[in-house]
Amino acid sequence: MRIVLLFLVVYSSIGYAQNSKVLIVGDSWAQQQYSDQVHDAVFDVNGYPDIQVLRNGDSDAVAIDGTTAADWVVPSELAKITDALINNPSVDTVQLTLGGNDFLNNWNTAMSVGQVNALKTTIVSDLQTIVEAILAVDMNIEIILSFYDYPNFEETTNDPWEFTCRDLHDDMLNPTPTEINSMALDFTNAFVAIANQNPKIFYVQHWGRMQNAYGWPDQGIQPGDIALPGDYTLTSPLEAMRTHLGFVKDCFHLEPEGYDILVQGLYDEYYRYRFDTIYKSHFE
């Protein structure tokens, strides 16, 4: 009996390793999607229950809350990403989410055009370094760039317990939704240029997904009324923003249900084609 149980455990482990196809890399948006286990649920409901996100010590080390693109180009940190791929050769798709903290921590409304462009160039250069290191591991790897949706600093900075979002908003010199969203769109467009230069890199945009999914029914704006890429003069609805301690609303991160919507979008626009062309014959 012990031999049979050992065989089943080993067989199960091997099967899991072979089916772990996606590595999630990046900041808090990556980490929360990883921790919420959204991808596996989305893959399952769309007909790919055997394809999973890698979950082990290697993957835990590369989806880290608060990190920046600048953090990950440090050789010791970049090695964590490449090591995760080398140690887990079943992975052939990397979902990369970085650049948001580089933007939020360094941009403010008083910056000149030259300063904004310099910051943008630095972030793009760091992202380029990261994607080049990933692609150098294996020519069959693809990268899907997955960034962000509109924040909500309008309804998350007024109460005493909302000091984190308030301090961040103050550091940016209190931009309006139009100011921060238009600048975020501009930065993202610069990031996306990386995908336009390499057939192994893909991009799915998320701007407006929460506005589209939730709307503001009490204001007469129903779910589905606002088409993608949304209205950059508005925030994401408060309902979509992540809740901490049962009552504190986040200004930037999404509820698990919001990430589910986001990952379904990734599936519709990228993963389904990746899986259909590469894996479908293996699971039929």
Predicted regions and their residues:
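Sec-dependent N-terminal signal peptides
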Residues: 3-13
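Residue-level recognition of alpha-helix boundary/capping or hinge positions
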Residues: 19-21, 29-32, 177-178, 182, ...
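Conserved SGNH/GDSL esterase-like catalytic core that processes O-acyl groups on lipids
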Residues: 19-23, 29-122
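Short hydrophobic segments within beta-strands
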Residues: 25-26, 146
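A solvent-exposed, charged loop/short amphipathic helix patch at secondary-structure junctions
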Residues: 104-122, 157-179, 242-244
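A short helix->loop->beta-strand "cap" motif at the edges of active sites that frequently abuts
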Residues: 137-142
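Substrate-gating cap/lid alpha-helix
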Residues: 153-207
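Histidine-centered active-site loop/cap adjacent to the catalytic His
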Residues: 228-276
